[in-house]
């Protein structure tokens, strides 16, 4: 019997009775959005890379039982994969296989034995664990054959990688005899200083050992390269040529996607905001150049003994300096090698108290994208600018490494000295008004003509005088001003001494015409004397000997001084007098001044009774009741009572009446205003 014919799924093959003839839905029959998919289109087609999808057990692992504990069919996972996935060449191969079945029956029977053996080997290989890093399964093979193959592949790939990175193959350099000096080579000297090496290597010294000095010298290779870079800049090989056109393969790829060669050029505006991808450099040559910069300098480490140098060599050689990707490359220096002829870049003999290492990474040793460091800013200078210094740090800091000299390098020092000597020892007759002492003598001799006199304002003179002050640092400016103030005070003291010695009528010129050093009070007195309106003011501090004797005189009749009393003794005596037993002790106390009586009517102490600041408060805990205090309080009461008697003439009462009248007038005026507002509102 033939196969049962099924109705086609396509809408065109349907019977006319099922077709909707409504013109509103006419587009449904032709619109692909409403057409049904074919069964073959349900499957996802995969290429040969995913051929193991149907064979690998990892894609077919399912649960052995369902959620109710019933056993599941293990072929369900295989059927599910066949239903969803299909290889690209599977559809075409299925038709060809059906036609060739009859021809290959004999071949299949003959090769059945071989296939069985292959299946056995496949099953054995499947039982073995396979290394799959994606799933984290399997064990790395450690057989000798794999090691040999890996070694061969590494040896084949190593020259290519080193050549691509610009790294020269390692040389077998002999270690040599052990000495107390070590050389450090192949380091990033743009970021490393002698202090960094001194501190880092000092931490590896054995007990009792120490570093004496770390010096950094330029190598012969570095001297020649730096001299060439000073004139010509970095080598041209590191830059890509300007006429670098895309290759034929790139053009073919661009034309394949519909891009024209002219469209690849960007506008100027796009170039301004274009990201720096390093396309202007040849990365291989740039990396090689950056690695060559590691050989521009070398460091010499001097230890106190051979034992210390040996320990540092064995510990640090081949280790990384912090996280900078720089590897210590240490060599012993023979004793007969000297560095007296070489000029060191920097020397460190002592670790600073507050040391902070710099965090840096050498891109040429670690990153795929290398940056050119030839024109980079000095990283130590950047740290110096950002750091907040104390006054002691500023004094200890050496600015000579970061500030250029004020004198020109091309100018001879002897010529400058001779010019200054001409300025100091030259006569006024020989000096020309329009000549410059810093010009060459040949120019001065050739300048013949009339003398031209020019006048400059005082502002220009002050600006020229203060030009040197602008170049001063903060500390130098502070010290200079302090010295000027000290000198000014000294000159003022000398001026006063000379005035006292010579007298007021002396007209001797002291050599000071500056108005700053003149006494303001003296100038005022001189002006008044010239006008004749005022006489010269006498010094109020001058006192005669008689007045001083009166202030400290002693009473001839009394043995004690007039101002001699002891307040503590007086308070004790007042307390002892209240107790009969202690009355005798009160008479033995000194400094009582028993015969002294205060003159409460003295006008000099009138403020005690009028000023509230001197009012006495008996409730205050610091109040001390004595005879003199009680006398003062009685006097204040008398004066207050006298003031009340003097007010009987009625003046205070009149003031009170006036205030009451003023308040009444204000109330009447307010009532009038309220009434007027009410009338206007009606």
From Swiss-Prot:
Residues spanning the membrane: none
Biological-process GO terms, alphabetical: rRNA processing
Biased composition (Acidic residues): 120-131, 145-157, 501-512
Residue numbers spanned by region Disordered: 1-32, 55-176, 457-564, 634-682
Keywords: Coiled coil, Nucleus, Phosphoprotein, Ribosome biogenesis, RNA-binding, rRNA processing
Domain of life (superkingdom): Eukaryota
Chain positions with Phosphothreonine modification: 121
The keyword DNA-binding appears for this protein: no
Coiled coil regions in record: 471-597
Compositionally skewed regions (Basic residues) per UniProt: 478-491, 525-534
Keyword Protein biosynthesis: no
Modified residues (Phosphoserine): 117, 125, 506
GO terms, molecular function: RNA binding
UniProt feature, compositional bias: Basic and acidic residues: 76-86, 468-477, 515-524, 544-554, 662-674
Subcellular localization, as worded in the UniProt entry: Nucleus, Nucleolus
InterPro entries: Esf1 (IPR039754), NUC153 (IPR012580), RRM_ESF1 (IPR056750)
GO CC aspect terms: nucleolus; nucleus
Bias kind Low complexity: ranges: 90-99
Role of this protein: Involved in the 18S rRNA synthesis. Required for the early cleavages at sites A0, A1 and A2.
Record PANTHER family: ESF1 HOMOLOG (PTHR12202:SF0)
Family as reported in the entry's similarity comment: Belongs to the ESF1 family.
Listed name of the protein: Pre-rRNA-processing protein esf1
